[in-house]
């Protein structure tokens, strides 16, 4: 029988959907339709500092998971992290990511969203390589947390509602902590250890986000990679912004600047000066120092229980996040 002129010669089904080429970085790409992953591949070509991968390796010093499982978990986290950045940049109307134009300015919004969504399912597909029967439930749980946190942050921005510090911390535990926790929970599921490392992971996630908020408004490195004070242009209620607004509840200047979503350099410089005048950057640095000290205490307790020397890699990550140790310009951006 002659092939139908309106039907393709290839079969698209479960087997066809899993045939993938492997990129030079070891991550799956779609063989037949590279356009599907083009926005994702574009973002990967300008890699970040990959702190999540470093954390996975560091925690595995305690958990001793086989290397093939670690590689799979790191692949899952990389796919999800980059997918979330593609979506974040659209939602925030960002202009730069890692020093280059954002993906949707090259490939368009629709194609970028589709590529990000595809990455979620490519990551989900990798779960089959893990031994833990609860891996899918863990994956779903933390992706729900991630979207819950992201949703609250978007709600505050769109409604011009300044959250409390407690609300902010809860959001960070969900949004930033989600992928941190996912990596370690998947590792724990492949390990013989029954010790819970999630409390330390939660501390690190909060430390990372508050430090990121601070750097966005204070770091020359961040300005180069993401634009000057991008959080102000986004109208984002970051940690120093929340403290500054609540330090002077009767003064609406900063709240109104956020409302404008201004790209004006002078306006953003004024906002930074205002935030500094309320002592909010100093307060932020104090919080970062406090979280770093608490993380070091948690790590010391783990080493005491599990054996000295196992925390060396984690301690190196902490030095990177500790602004006193690394210097405030150190770049750990996404």
From Swiss-Prot:
The EC number(s) this enzyme carries: 2.5.1.-, 2.5.1.1, 2.5.1.29, 2.5.1.10
GO molecular function, one term: dimethylallyltranstransferase activity
Binding site for dimethylallyl diphosphate: 97, 175-176, 209, 216, 226, 236
Record InterPro entries: Isoprenoid_synthase_dom_sf, Polyprenyl_synt, Polyprenyl_synt_CS
Residues given in the record as isopentenyl diphosphate binding sites: 49, 52, 81, 98
This protein's UniProt keywords: Magnesium, Metal-binding, Transferase
Protein name, per record: Geranylgeranyl pyrophosphate synthase idtG
Organism listed in the record: Claviceps paspali (Rye ergot fungus)
Taxonomic classification: Eukaryota, Fungi, Dikarya, Ascomycota, Pezizomycotina
Gene designation per UniProt: idtG
């Amino acid at each position: 029988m002659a092939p139908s002129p309106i039907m393709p010669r290839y079969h698209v089904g479960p087997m066809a959907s899993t045939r993938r080429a492997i990129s030079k970085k070891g991550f799956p790409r779609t063989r037949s339709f590279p356009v599907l992953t083009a926005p994702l591949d574009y973002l990967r070509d300008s890699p970040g500092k990959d702190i999540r991968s470093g954390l996975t390796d560091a925690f595995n010093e305690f958990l001793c998971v086989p290397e093939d499982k670690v590689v799979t978990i790191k692949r899952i986290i990389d796919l999800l992290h980059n997918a979330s950045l593609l979506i974040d940049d659209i939602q925030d109307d960002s202009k730069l990511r890692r020093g280059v134009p954002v993906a949707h300015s090259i490939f368009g919004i629709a194609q970028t969203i589709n590529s990000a969504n595809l990455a979620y399912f490519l990551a989900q597909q990798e779960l089959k390589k893990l031994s833990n029967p609860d891996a899918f439930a863990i994956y779903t749980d933390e992706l729900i947390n991630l979207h819950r946190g992201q949703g609250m942050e978007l709600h505050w921005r769109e409604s011009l509602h300044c959250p409390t510090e407690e609300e902010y911390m809860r959001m960070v535990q969900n949004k930033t902590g989600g992928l941190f926790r996912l990596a370690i929970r998947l590792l724990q599921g492949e390990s013989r250890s029954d010790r819970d490392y999630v409390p330390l992971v939660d501390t690190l996630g909060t430390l990372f986000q508050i430090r990121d908020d601070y750097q966005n408004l204070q770091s020359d490195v961040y300005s180069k990679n993401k634009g000057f004070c991008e959080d102000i242009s986004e109208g984002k209620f970051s940690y120093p912004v929340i403290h500054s607004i609540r330090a002077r509840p009767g003064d609406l200047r900063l709240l109104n600047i956020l409302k404008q979503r201004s790209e004006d350099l002078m306006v953003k410089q004024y906002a930074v000066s205002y935030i500094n005048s309320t002592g909010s950057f100093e307060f932020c640095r104090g919080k970062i120092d406090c979280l770093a000290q608490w993380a070091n205490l948690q790590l010391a307790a783990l080493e005491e229980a599990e054996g000295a020397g196992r925390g060396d890699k984690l301690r190196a990550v902490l030095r990177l996040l500790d602004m006193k140790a690394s210097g405030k310009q150190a770049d750990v951006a996404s």
